[in-house]
Amino acid sequence: MANLKWFFIFLRSRIYWILWLLFLHFIFLGIAYLDYDISVYSILYIIILNIGLSVLFLIFTYLKEVKFYKHLDENIEPEALKHKSLADTPFQQEMVNYLYGQITNQKALVTHQKQQIQSTEAALTDFVHDIKTPVTAMKLLIEKEQDLSRKHALLYEWSRINDMLDRQLFLTRLEYQNKDMYFEHVPLKRLVIEEIQITRYISQSKGIGYDLDFEDTLNVYTDTKWCRMMIRQVLSNAVKYSEESMIHIRALKESRHVVLEIKDEGKGISEKDLPRIFDKGFTSTSNRNNTISSGLGLYLVNHVKEKLSICVRIHSELDKGTVVKFIFPNQNEIVAKLSQNI
């Protein structure tokens, strides 16, 4: 089928030449018909011979020229076309030289843009690291505040700033995540409680409590830093979209896997939005007045879950709440996946 496609493309490219030959043949037949001194049979013989030779010439040209375009279609680099002398005609050689020049320029442009992006990401990472120092110092100053209501208000805003800085830091590290992972056995309860501690100021200001149901012996084989980030994004969303309610967190063993379930009683997600919740920058279509949503939390979760081999399932009903499940792999599954990537 591929050869047939190329043959029809070749015929279309030669259609005017073929029509010109047919036109000349009709002219010759017309002259022979009008001039009795010229034998029609002789003209027919010449025409048939000419058509036969033309067909052979077309086949030869097709085999010679289409080979070059097939190589282009197979995405062979122009350097290979030049070095292997696959461009037979002067026109093909000019085309290869043009493509070579364009691709060289594009590669140089892409390299320059990559360097700019890496430079920007490095500068942004340095900025976040640098600003974390005064932010940490700010918390120490806030802790000394005597007015409790003022202290809680300041800690609430501090938590938001710290969360945004951490999220930005993780975003800049996404590209290098493979180089920034260390798998180990970690108590799941410890991971969750550490993240609850980080969000406690915002939770307290919104009247949100936590209901924990854990088995103390449940450990997961994962990367602590990136797994905590995933839990934090889900907890952050649960707190952000809830008021005066409870967040229920439980962990259990199902089959050979540990399952972490985080359930809130917040605004929930509409059914039409569920397929898009992992898209970067996507925020709810049912709550367009909310200006604090960044649309980055679940985007981060979606990227990281593949690297950690964690299955994430989300069920939600509008105005009823959301349930997020993390299904952790066992150690053998992680080792097998890492072995495939070596």
Curated annotation (Swiss-Prot):
GO terms for molecular function: ATP binding; phosphoprotein phosphatase activity; phosphorelay sensor kinase activity. Its main location: membrane. The chain crosses the membrane at residues 15-35, 43-63. GO terms for biological process: cellular response to phosphate starvation; response to antibiotic. It is found in: Cell membrane. Residues 126-332 form the Histidine kinase domain. The keyword Transmembrane applies. SUPFAM superfamilies: ATPase domain of HSP90 chaperone/DNA topoisomerase II/histidine kinase, Homodimeric domain of signal transducing histidine kinase. It is a multi-pass membrane protein. It catalyses: ATP + protein L-histidine = ADP + protein N-phospho-L-histidine. Its EC number is 2.7.13.3. The modification Phosphohistidine is found at H129. GO terms for cellular component: plasma membrane. Autophosphorylated. Keywords: Antibiotic resistance, ATP-binding, Cell membrane, Kinase, Membrane, Nucleotide-binding, Phosphoprotein, Transferase, Transmembrane, Transmembrane helix, Two-component regulatory system, Virulence. Member of the two-component regulatory system GraR/GraS involved in resistance against cationic antimicrobial peptides (CAMPs). GraS probably functions as a sensor protein kinase which is autophosphorylated at a histidine residue and transfers its phosphate group to GraR. This is Sensor histidine kinase GraS. It comes from Staphylococcus saprophyticus subsp. saprophyticus (strain ATCC 15305 / DSM 20229 / NCIMB 8711 / NCTC 7292 / S-41). The gene is graS.
